[in-house]
Amino acid sequence: MEGQRWLPLEANPEVTNQFLKQLGLHPNWQFVDVYGMEPELLSMVPRPVCAVLLLFPITEKYEVFRTEEEEKIKSQGQDVTSSVYFMKQTISNACGTIGLIHAIANNKDKMHFESGSALKKFLEESVAMSPEERARHLENYDAIRVTHETSAHEGQTEAPSIDEKVDLHFIALVHVDGHLYELDGRKPFPINHGKTSDETLLEDAIEVCKKFMERDPDELRFNAIALSAA
């Protein structure tokens, strides 16, 4: 039996900020556009930045790389701090919402939540769960599903049919305990991309984004947004 399928979210700060507001996040942190990967364009992004979301196309080249990366990490191992909040993706097209959850969950101490926040409740209930259990919890969490659905209709482009196959995917890049982690619910575990800091997170995350673009030089469908202090 096929699992749940949601409408995809746009990588649009207006949509993501409204979505988080509806889930009870105080707007002291806001998503902003990253207009380009060059230093002068990155200098326009308000600091500090605590997370970057990348929207990218799932291509054959990427899927080959993903398989190779997974096998390499399984054979060589990697260090992942237990402080990382990571969840699997079991709902089709929910990668935008999962990216937002990854961004907020790994910066929870910096965030302010309104009383009765559905997102805060979800994070508190799932803090001790496994990545798979968190995925199942999201499947049954109506407050987030309904808000996602509303937000998917609020983008600048018309939302596709719920049955349409979408080949764009969101990941979150976050700083936890001195390291930069790529969080992708399609992958079996977080990916440690090396050292980072609150001050250098944006630049370090963009270096990871550039590698995605270099793997698919013929593709133009890349978009990054940063979670910045408002």
Curated annotation (Swiss-Prot):
Residues 8-13, 219-224 are annotated as: Interaction with ubiquitin. GO terms for cellular component: cytoplasm. Its EC number is 3.4.19.12. The keyword Phosphoprotein applies. Keywords: Cytoplasm, Hydrolase, Phosphoprotein, Protease, Thiol protease, Ubl conjugation pathway. PROSITE patterns: UCH_1 (PS00140), UCH_DOMAIN (PS52048). It catalyses: Thiol-dependent hydrolysis of ester, thioester, amide, peptide and isopeptide bonds formed by the C-terminal Gly of ubiquitin (a 76-residue protein attached to proteins as an intracellular targeting signal). Residues 5-229 form the UCH catalytic domain. Coiled coil: none annotated. GO terms for biological process: adult walking behavior; cellular response to insulin stimulus; eating behavior; positive regulation of fat cell differentiation; protein catabolic process; protein deubiquitination; retina development in camera-type eye; ubiquitin-dependent protein catabolic process. Pfam families: Peptidase_C12 (PF01088). The modification Phosphoserine is found at residue 130. The record marks 89 as: Transition state stabilizer. Its main location: cytoplasm. It is found in: Cytoplasm. Deubiquitinating enzyme (DUB) that controls levels of cellular ubiquitin through processing of ubiquitin precursors and ubiquitinated proteins. Thiol protease that recognizes and hydrolyzes a peptide bond at the C-terminal glycine of either ubiquitin or NEDD8. Has a 10-fold preference for Arg and Lys at position P3, and exhibits a preference towards 'Lys-48'-linked ubiquitin chains. Deubiquitinates ENAC in apical compartments, thereby regulating apical membrane recycling. This is Ubiquitin carboxyl-terminal hydrolase isozyme L3. It comes from Rattus norvegicus (Rat). The gene is Uchl3.
